[in-house]
Structure formats: structure tokens, C-alpha cells
Amino acid sequence: MQETQIPITQIDETPKAVEPSVWKNLFTQGVWTNNSTLVQLLGLCPLLAVSNNVTNALGLGLATLLVLTITNTIISLFRKVIPHDIRIPIYVMIIATAVTTIQLLMNAFAFPVYQSLGIFVPLIVTNCIVIGRAEAFASKNSVAHSAFDGFAMGLGMTLSLVVLGAIREIIGNGTLFDGLDLLLGSWAKALRMDLLHLDSGLLLAILPPGAFIGLGLILAVKNIIDRKK
């Protein structure tokens, strides 16, 4: 009876060869392919409410990014000891702790932006994006991958917020990066630009209906780009 030999090339797969594609996939999923705002359409309430300029949009985006990264890391770190039956309340407590920390930091170092964002900073606790990534990804994957997933998802939301905020600020006020120094410091005053010299901007752009119209335009552009690929 002859023995069949398995070619060595069939089992020549190492984690090192696969690992780079994992990081790339997590990044592209979070920023573009599975963007929490433009694909999943999650967290629209704060997105539409505070994106009337770049400063507010960037402030909320960075806060959400930090919360996603921190909570994903902590939940993944303790995923094996968190009881399955009460995991959701525990996730909410972890998220609330991270949000409170970010809220206190914003209150201390970026108070004008904190005042402008108002209730939408503490409402990050109830954001479907944060609890969704905790349940769907962080509770099932390694700490490093979970932290990077939180960063990528947060970055995708931040970019969406900033683009929408820029469109609304330009059309509504004719400026770009106005008040950014309130978030990033006095050096950011040099970034302010007057793009449209109008007696009065289009008020609709900085009102809630303008947010819906702007988001619809961004979604349309993304769909066109995806179809051409």
C-alpha cells in the first residue's frame, strides 16, 4: 500500500504573511468599506446636530474616536472574565467611564467647544457605534486588533463629521476652520480661511435640514466612487 505525500507548499502559511492584510482590512473597513456613518448610518443624531462647522465636528469626532479606542481595548482585555449574561450593562459602565473622562478633559482644556457640543458629549454613552463595536468585535478579538478597530471606526466617523462640517461651514458662513483655535490652541488661528465673501451665507446650510442635504450628497458621492471600483 503506497503512502500519499502532501506537498509542502499546501501548508506553507505563516501568521506573519497574513498579519499585514488583517491590519489593512481593519483600517479600510473602519474608514471606508464599513464606515459607521456613511454605510451603517449609525450615530446620526450627534452627526447632524453638531456638524455645522469643522471645529464642533472635529471635537465630537475626536471624543468618539478616543472613547471607541479606550472601550474596545478595555473590553477586549477583560473579555474572558466578563460574565456573558450581564455583559451589556458592564459594557455600558465601561463606556460611561471613558466618556466621563473625555468629558472632564474637554471641560478643562477645550471649554468653549465643550459648551458648544453640550449634551452630545455625554450622549456618546448611548451611541450605537460604541456599543456595537464592543459587542461585535472587541468581545471576540485580541486587544491589539480591538484597539485598532476602535481607532479605525472612530477615524471613519471623524472624517465623515469633518467633511460634512466643512461643507456646511463654507456654504453657511463662507469660512473654513473658524474657531479651530478653541480646540487645538492659539496656533490654529492661522488655519482660518475666508473662502466665500458674502454679505450673508446660506442659512439653510447650518440648520438641521442642511445637515440632511449635506449627508445625502456625501452618501451619493461615496456610492458613485464605490460603483466605479
Curated annotation (Swiss-Prot):
Matches recorded under Pfam families: Rnf-Nqr
Protein location: Cell inner membrane
Protein's name according to its UniProt entry: Ion-translocating oxidoreductase complex subunit E
Keywords (A to Z) from UniProt: Cell inner membrane, Cell membrane, Electron transport, Membrane, Translocase, Transmembrane, Transmembrane helix, Transport
Quaternary state and interactors: The complex is composed of six subunits: RnfA, RnfB, RnfC, RnfD, RnfE and RnfG.
NCBIfam families attached to this UniProt entry: PRK12405.1, rnfE
One GO BP: electron transport chain
Annotated gene: rnfE
Membrane association type: Multi-pass membrane protein
Ranges that cross the membrane: 58-78, 82-102, 105-125, 147-167, 201-221
Enzyme Commission identifier(s): 7.-.-.-
